[in-house]
């Protein structure tokens, strides 16, 4: 966020905020300071809240999982979106 944006009170879009949060989570996880996947329930709640602004979904419609294999980590998000 630039100083001008801060002074004018411009707000970040939810997509950029979500991207920043995911980057922080991944960086934190890679540094080894966190227990494995302790943030997933909070991440799932936040994703449901953001997606619910645009599409009607419930907690059961979104699943978040983290898989580890050797030195590779995969964050998987599955969303069931109802048909219109």
Curated annotation (Swiss-Prot):
S-S bridge residues? none
Gene3D superfamilies in the record, alphabetically?
Cell division topological specificity factor MinE (3.30.1070.10)
Q: Which domain of life is it from?
A: Bacteria
Q: Which GO terms describe its biological process?
A: cell division; regulation of division septum assembly
Where is the signal peptide, in residue numbers?
A: none
User: What keywords is this UniProt entry annotated with?
Assistant: Cell cycle, Cell division
Give a Pfam family name: MinE
Family membership, please give it.
Answer: Belongs to the MinE family.
> Which NCBIfam families does the record match to this protein?
minE, PRK00296.1, PRK13989.1
Q: What does this protein do?
A: Prevents the cell division inhibition by proteins MinC and MinD at internal division sites while permitting inhibition at polar sites. This ensures cell division at the proper site by restricting the formation of a division septum at the midpoint of the long axis of the cell.
What's the protein name? Cell division topological specificity factor
Q: Which organism is it from?
A: Cupriavidus metallidurans (strain ATCC 43123 / DSM 2839 / NBRC 102507 / CH34)
Q: Which gene encodes it?
A: minE
């Amino acid at each position: 966020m630039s100083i001008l944006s801060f002074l004018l009170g411009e707000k970040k879009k939810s997509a950029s905020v979500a991207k920043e949060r995911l980057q922080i989570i991944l960086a934190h996880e890679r540094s080894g300071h966190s227990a494995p996947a302790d943030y997933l329930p909070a991440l799932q709640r936040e994703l449901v809240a953001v997606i619910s602004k645009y599409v009607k979904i419930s907690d059961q419609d979104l699943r978040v999982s983290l898989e580890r294999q050797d030195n590779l980590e995969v964050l998987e998000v599955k969303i069931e979106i109802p048909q219109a």
